[in-house]
Amino acid sequence: HSKQKGRLHPFEILSIGGDDVFLIVPAHAALPIATTIAEEAEKALSGRPITRRDKGYEWTRVHRIQMPYETKPTVQSKVGLSSGVVIAHHCTPVFFLRRLVEELLKSAKGKAKRLRDKGYYGATVDFLVLKSTAMIATNIHDFRRSALKRNNLHLTAKPYTVPELYALLEVVKRLKREDFPRSQLYRLREQLEKGWLASIVEYFYFQARLRSSEEVRKALDKVWIGTEQQKGPKSIGLWMRRENDDPENYEFETVLGDL
């Protein structure tokens, strides 16, 4: 990984086999390292004729963020290095971490496969912050369905494409630069539990009275706009339209629960 302020991050390679790599790195650097590996792998492979794809994709149909540049991607790699990332305490058993990572990787690859139908061949990343081993009673899918879903609302937007994950990390950096109160962030997250309308009202009220609200808008709802939908309600406030198999049953998701 590239140097950060003149230092290299320590890491441990537990296994390399086939196209899978299992690494242990410092928690604060795990997501930046995952995005860097995916991006560098794609750059290298897109320069080789056998893995180069001279065809772009429609940004607004793939990524849920504003396009950060004017030109659309025109060259891709046919191979993307998706990742599963677990951020956990150092004493967590490795065998348990590996099981969770494999679940997350399967989830990330599932999204990558669906996005191929839209012409996107890049990597995706799914991650989990594990507070205790008792947090996941069965598997990650069941945990998210019970703890992070309220009717048609998903309190998470995972998995992410690599550009989306970069944008999410930028949100964190911007909020830190502005000394954004964590208590306010926790309060906004609590409002998500109350439902779509209540959380939107609280969010707009919060924006009206907070001095740094413009920075929050720049980092969140001016960046996270959701993908282009053919019909139905659009994204509003902290909620983005979620794509599902049944376009008649509208679902929403938010990145706020992932910050």
Could you say what each language-model-derived stretch is?
Residues H1-L259:
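Charged, helix-rich terminal subdomains or tails
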